[in-house]
């Protein structure tokens, strides 16, 4: 949205979100930019979509807002049962402690691993993820179990 020149919550997209909700599709979004002059994919915009379409499953990339993590905590994280997160292209830009905190804050059952390839290679993203002080159970959940449950519909 930031590069394409539209806002995530623009009125023209509402019929699309409605159709996706009816079809039980997943809306996977780039979120965040931290450039106030653009702000097309802010956590606030995702929150408005989540509120307006409570049965639409949303995955908010970059922990709900690339470089807007505080804003994501204020208006998005923990507020909507239909919003999930990925950690793509974020862990390299924060301390391991902050990464662990965000995984826990978002919910260890609601975060999925992601690389944001080609921006960040999978090898770099995985190395950044593995440096976090997480239990094996949480690590496995984020690396694949959450995806299997949230996206693929597997019970585990």
Regions found by a protein language model. Give the residues of each.
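Short glycine-enriched loops at secondary-structure junctions
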Residues: 65, 118-119
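The substrate-binding groove and active-site-proximal loops of carbohydrate-active enzymes
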Residues: 1-7
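Catalytic pocket-lining loop regions of alpha/beta-barrel enzymes
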Residues: 7-112
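Mid-to-C-terminal alpha-helical segments outside catalytic/metal-binding sites
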Residues: 105-112, 119-156
